[in-house]
Amino acid sequence: MDKLVVNYYEYKHPIINKDLAIGAHGGKKFPTLGAWYDVINEYEFQTRCPIILKNSHRNKHFTFACHLKNCPFKVLLSYAGNAASSETSSPSANNNTNPPGTPDHIHHHSNNMNNEDNDNNNGSNNKVSNDSKLDFVTDDLEYHLANTHPDDTNDKVESRSNEVNGNNDDDADANNIFKQQGVTIKNDTEDDSINKASIDRGLDDESGPTHGNDSGNHRHNEEDDVHTQMTKNYSDVVNDEDINVAIANAVANVDSQSNNKHDGKDDDATNNNDGQDNNTNNDHNNNSNINNNNVGSHGISSHSPSSIRDTSMNLDVFNSATDDIPGPFVVTKIEPYHSHPLEDNLSLGKFILTKIPKILQNDLKFDQILESSYNNSNHTVSKFKVSHYVEESGLLDILMQRYGLTAEDFEKRLLSQIARRITTYKARFVLKKKKMGEYNDLQPSSSSNNNNNNDGELSGTNLRSNSIDYAKHQEISSAGTSSNTTKNVNNNKNDSNDDNNGNNNNDASNLMESVLDKTSSHRYQPKKMPSVNKWSKPDQITHSDVSMVGLDESNDGGNENVHPTLAEVDAQEARETAQLAIDKINSYKRSIDDKNGDGHNNSSRNVVDENLINDMDSEDAHKSKRQHLSDITLEERNEDDKLPHEVAEQLRLLSSHLKEVENLHQNNDDDVDDVMVDVDVESQYNKNTTHHNNHHSQPHHDEEDVAGLIGKADDEEDLSDENIQPELRGQ
């Protein structure tokens, strides 16, 4: 696969290969930078692989690389210096009488214009090109676009071997075409297993010029014994015929374009024999063009290994004025191999998109257009319409002429992508002006429209948020109502239990209420009003913003019940422990009642049980009242949130009751200690009961244990240290 990729890229184009660099034969020269671009543009169009200018230095050194970052393809092009250095580096430059950097075909063109005035019947006048960009002279050039005049007898055609008659018929047609252009194709000996192809270009002979008609009649039979042109060999080319046909097609394509321009005819005129022309040389040239087109259609088919695309790029429409830097230029280093197959390259549409910026810059002078629009529109390009420019600028015409596209190829998607490239180019221009501080951003009409649109969007958002906030508010309010109803029912039950506990419990509850008032004032931390909208003015707060504030406050109120304080958690644990103790006492009570029918024992146990139960009920009553009071404080808090002056009052109360709150925590710890003492009493009672069960045959021990338990319940100071939990000792 790698071998196929290497050959496919290296030998697809007769110039872009290893032999392009300076070597033993002196390499190839390009008179201008535009001549090099003609070659590289054709190469990248055939391969659909964009070649980018990676670096340049003072218009002397240029680095070209593949558009893929990891691809090793690279060409280094450098300025070759003056004419003296050029003569020493090229063996064929000794006979070159043209000034440095001036193509040979331009010199011939100037001489031929004088001959055209003298002899209008010369059929070779149609071969003169009017576009000097198409042709360039290189030393030892295999694939070139030279237009030499057939009357110039200095152009001698040479052959390495005298076996011209041994070529097949297909090669004969191609050789005839090249001989008319001053170029011939040579083959090595037939004994080689791999044929070698080379193309020599005729040079000026020292002998004097002869008549043009003699040169035209005996053009194909002249042979020069002196070999003054060195050739390039391609040892890896599989088939000479494929390379020859590809080169013949390229030259024929350029010739047909040049003749059409010169005669003022369309491209299709070359496919018809001009029967009305009295000049036989013109007929001969037209027939040659027909043969070239036929050979080209065969050579560029999809099955031919020497060509990739069915169409060649039209170099006539290139505007290389900016690239026409005088040379000569030579390739100092080349790495023609790619690391990716041709199938992975770009499609024609994507390839064209990569060329849009350069066409805008060089061909359409888009920078000048933007600058003109910028100056005429008060330092802005807002009036510049990209869609109108795509249709009216002639960009599509350039793409159709250069890359062989038709109007049907420009689909809507491709046009939008082209417009996007132009928009990107325009955006870079605007960014450059903004960095310079020259761009005018003030656009009242557009800004007012944007403000109106933003207001509409905000109003729609507010409407949606209002509906959502209202639904959430309804859910939260309903949930709060149901929870408050349940709490009120529980509080009513607890109040009825409190009435049965006596005056002592009422005093304790009153004390607990005062404590809870201080606790709620300490626990309440007034929040700042949230910033509703940092872009809104104070008088532009919407209804949704107010509803969000209410929603946050309601959520905060609900979180108080969801996340109780540490004192409430401790009280809940103590309540659960007391309930377990009561259940155990009841079970022990039933077991004792079944075994002992003594009324005295039952009465004593009932006294203990009632005392414990009353203590637990009083604790539950205190906790329920605390919960009820906390609910009341939550309601008051919601009201306080709406009144800032009451919030300030709460802050003052908080600072004044700080010390009382600290005392409150100490009192809560004492209450927890009392509960733990009750649990100790229960554990002592359990031990005595177990002892009684083990010695049920001795009832007098039970009476003593019960009496001792009653005495300990009445007087807690008589408890020994062993029966007190370690954390409560010494208190």
Swiss-Prot record:
Biological processes annotated in GO: chromatin remodeling; DNA-templated DNA replication; global genome nucleotide-excision repair; negative regulation of transcription by RNA polymerase II; positive regulation of transcription by RNA polymerase II; silent mating-type cassette heterochromatin formation
Complex formation: Component of the global genome repair (GGR) complex composed of at least ABF1, RAD7 and RAD16. Interacts with PSE1.
Additional notes on this entry: Present with 4820 molecules/cell in log phase SD medium.
Modified residues (Phosphothreonine): T189
Biased composition (Basic and acidic residues): 149-161, 634-643
Organism for this UniProt entry: Saccharomyces cerevisiae (strain ATCC 204508 / S288c)
Biased composition (Basic residues): 689-698
Keyword check for Signal: no
InterPro entries the record matches: BAF1_ABF1 (IPR006774)
Positions of region (Disordered): 84-132, 146-227, 251-308, 439-463, 475-539, 590-643, 687-731
Name the record gives this protein: ARS-binding factor 1
Family to which this protein belongs: Belongs to the BAF1 family.
C-terminal sequence 2: annotated segments: 639-662
UniProt comment concerning the protein's domains: Contains 2 important clusters of amino acid residues in the C terminus (C-terminal sequence 1 or CS1, residues 624 to 628; and CS2, residues 639 to 662). CS1 specifically participates in transcriptional silencing and/or repression in a context-dependent manner, whereas CS2 is universally required for all functions of ABF1.
Primary residence: nucleus
Function: General regulatory factor (GRF) that contributes to transcriptional activation of a large number of genes, as well as to DNA replication, silencing and telomere structure. Involved in the transcription activation of a subset of ribosomal protein genes. Binds the ARS-elements found in many promoters. Binds to the sequence 5'-TCN(7)ACG-3'. Influences on genome-wide nucleosome occupancy and affects chromatin structure, and probably dynamics.
Alphabetic keyword roster: Activator, DNA damage, DNA repair, DNA replication, DNA-binding, Isopeptide bond, Nucleus, Phosphoprotein, Transcription, Transcription regulation, Ubl conjugation
Subcellular location(s) per record: Nucleus
Post-translational modification as stated in the protein's UniProt record: Extensively phosphorylated on Ser and Thr residues.
Region (C-terminal sequence 1): 624-628
Modification Phosphoserine occurs at: S193, S467, S554, S618, S624, S720
One matching Pfam family: BAF1_ABF1
GO molecular function, one term: sequence-specific DNA binding
Cross-link position per record: Glycyl lysine isopeptide (Lys-Gly) (interchain with G-Cter in ubiquitin): K18
GO CC term, one of those recorded: nucleotide-excision repair factor 4 complex
